Amino acid sequence: MKHPLETLLSAAGILLLALLSCLLLPAPSLGLTLAQKLVETFHMMDLNQLYTVLFCLWFLALGAIEYLVLRWVWRRWFSLER
C-alpha cells in the first residue's frame, strides 16, 4: 500500500529542493573565450542566449538528481511498505 500523501510530498519536496538549488548552488560560469567559442559553435546570437540555455540545462540536471535523491530517501526511510 502506498502512502496517501506520497505524490503530494514528492512534488513539494522537488519544488523546495529546486528553490534551494537556485538560491544556494552556483551555476556554472564559463570563461569569456570558451563562452564565445560555444556561441560560434552552436550558432547563437550572443552570450545571453548561451547562458539561458546553459542555466536551463544546469537546473534541469540538478532537478533530476534531486528528484532521484528525494525518491530514494522517501522509499528508504519513510515508506510504509516493509
Swiss-Prot record:
Protein name: Uncharacterized protein in ramA 3'region
Lineage: Bacteria, Pseudomonadati, Pseudomonadota, Gammaproteobacteria, Enterobacterales
Transmembrane segments: 8-28, 50-70
Organism: Klebsiella pneumoniae
This protein's GO CC annotations: plasma membrane
Keyword Membrane part of the UniProt annotation: yes
Subcellular location: Cell membrane
Membrane topology: Multi-pass membrane protein
Pfam families, per the entry: DUF1158
UniProt entry keywords in alphabetical sequence: Cell membrane, Membrane, Transmembrane, Transmembrane helix
